[in-house]
Design a protein with these regions (language model features):
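Helix-turn-helix
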Residues: 6-9, 17-51, 55
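Short, hydrophobic secondary-structure boundary micro-motifs
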Residues: 101-105, 146, 174, 198-199
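Amphipathic alpha-helical packing segments from all-alpha helical-bundle domains
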Residues: 62-66, 113-140, 149-153, 180
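C-terminal peripheral helix-coil segments that are non-catalytic and often amphipathic
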Residues: 88-91, 127-139, 158, 164-210
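Generic hydrophobic, amphipathic alpha-helix propensity
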Residues: 6-14, 31, 56-60, 64, ...
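Hydrophobic/aromatic residues within well-ordered alpha-helical segments
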Residues: 49, 56, 60, 64, ...
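Amphipathic alpha-helical segments used for helix-helix packing
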Residues: 93-114, 131, 164, 168
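Hydrophobic alpha-helical connector segments
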Residues: 55, 69-95, 151-155, 179, ...
Length: 210
């Protein structure tokens, strides 16, 4: 079996075990034994527990980002792109509930340190697409010009929080059923910044005239 195929098998089994057991109870030995691999094969693919857990995290985030990027870049207008982003976000969470719960969870610093470099490579493309989306929305008059972190909190924050609750069993409505409501919430939140900007400018002009 090729190195690539072995790595894929390890990641699939590690994903299953991490999402079922949690990081604390997860072991490389458990993955090795489930797949019938030698210790050497496991070590060659992933040298440590944090490295394997980080790889699962990065692969999960990359899969989510691919879905979001495809949705955003396939839309023919700013409004449609935002709606597509929210829909893709909710659909991915619903289709990958256990993995989403793992991604939303709090992972040890040692795992995040291992994930930092490969995740940054994926984030570069994803953040570029988000920057283009928010610029498009701003130029369309649907929001003020904002830093990405602020725009992202307003746009995806409600959907992200609902997804977090749903994956933990604290909410019962499947995410897809809330697509329209959360799309409207995102549009309204971003639009509120544009209105605020307009009011500020009007007040400034009045002050200058006075």
């Amino acid at each position: 079996m090729s190195t690539t195929a072995t790595r894929a098998r390890i990641l699939a089994e590690a994903t299953r075990q991490l999402t079922e057991l949690g990081y604390a109870a997860f072991t490389i030995a458990g993955v090795r034994d489930a797949l019938g691999l030698s210790s050497g094969s496991m070590f060659h693919a992933f040298a440590s527990k944090p490295a394997l857990a980080a790889a699962v995290y990065v692969e999960g985030m990359a899969d989510y980002q691919r879905a979001a990027i495809t949705a955003i870049t396939s839309a023919d207008s700013a409004d449609a792109a935002l709606r597509a982003f929210i829909a893709a976000h909710l659909a991915w969470i619903e289709d990958h509930r256990a993995l989403a719960r793992y991604l939303f969870g709090s992972l040890p610093d040692e795992v995040m340190a291992e994930a930092a470099r490969p995740l940054a490579e994926h984030n570069a493309q994803f953040f570029g697409v988000l920057d283009a989306l928010y610029l498009r929305l701003s130029r369309a008059g649907l929001m003020a010009a904002l830093d990405r972190s602020v725009a992202q909190a307003l746009c995806i924050g409600p959907a992200q929080e609902y997804g977090r609750q749903w994956t933990r069993g604290l909410a019962s409505i499947p995410p897809r059923k809330l697509t329209r409501a959360l799309q409207a919430a995102a549009l309204a939140a971003l639009a509120s910044t544009s209105s605020s900007t307009a009011r500020t400018r009007r007040n400034t002009r009045r002050t200058e005239r006075d």
